[in-house]
Curated annotation (Swiss-Prot):
Keyword rRNA processing included in the entry's annotation: yes
Family: Belongs to the UTP16 family.
Coiled coil location: 180-219
Subunit structure: Component of the ribosomal small subunit (SSU) processome.
Subcellular location: Nucleus, Nucleolus
GO biological process, one term: maturation of SSU-rRNA
Protein name in the entry: U3 small nucleolar RNA-associated protein 16
Transmembrane segments: none
Amino acid sequence: MQSSRKIMILKRNIKGLKSSAIIATYLTLNKLFIDKFCKTQESTYPIHFVHCHFGGIKKFHSHCQLSSSYTNSGQKSFKSFNSLRFIVLKSKTCLLRYKLLIKTFCCITYSKIENLSNTRMARLTAPSKGPSFSNLNKPNDLLKAEIEDNEASHYSQNQSSDSDSDEAPEEVSLKSSSDEVKKRLQRLKGNELQLRKAEREKRRLQNERNRERNAQRVSASKLDLAILEAAEVEEINSTTEIEEKVDEASLDLYTPKGHKIVFPNNEIPKKRTRSFRKGDFKVSVLKETNDPLLAPNYEKKLSQRKRDWINRQSVPRASKRRRPLTY
């Protein structure tokens, strides 16, 4: 029942009103009033709502209507009468929440603009023609009859208007664009649900791993404590048994004499390493490889390399003879 209730926002064409003022006015609607309005039964409600804009308080009159023209198949119905066009929105779609939808499609203009310079508070009041919530408790049959009478009166007043036909291009474009926005909102909602589900699953796995780790830590600490207690008890028992069995006189037979007892905590002296005298050379033999980075003749012995170097130093270089000057 709740899903079948819809809100239809009518529009009139009034010149001289900025779109920013229209959208800002809708953003100042009270959420509690919208919820209360959407939960009522099907009827027609003329609504006054006040908005402060550019230092002055203006009173805008809009005509809102509840209707059951929303089909079960989920398609939005577009009607027109008395130069009024409206689109159907779900009652759950709060105007404050879906600002993009309102800004794009609701295109609302207002039929009455009055300056209220002395008013300081924004109030929701009923129009002068009648009370706004007078027919809340009426049965559905009477409410539907009143809606049909209002539609018939609107049709009779403007029979010659051709711009309000059901096949108007503006309505077709509105319908297509509204369907696109509806699909986009559904995709965004599905993506948000998937992200939330993945985040919940991730948190659940992390919590499960944390619980397992904590349980392992507790069990390990208990096991370590039990092992330590058992070792302590065993050590106490073994020491008491040794003290009871071993005699002090028999210990002198087994104590070593003339030998230094080295305990593990004492430093063990380092082993003596071979020290090379100055002038000695230590040659490291490299394995035969195909590595081109090695220097040539690296496989020669050190003595041969030293001998070759001495021979090179003893042989003087051939000095370059100066060429004779030729004229």
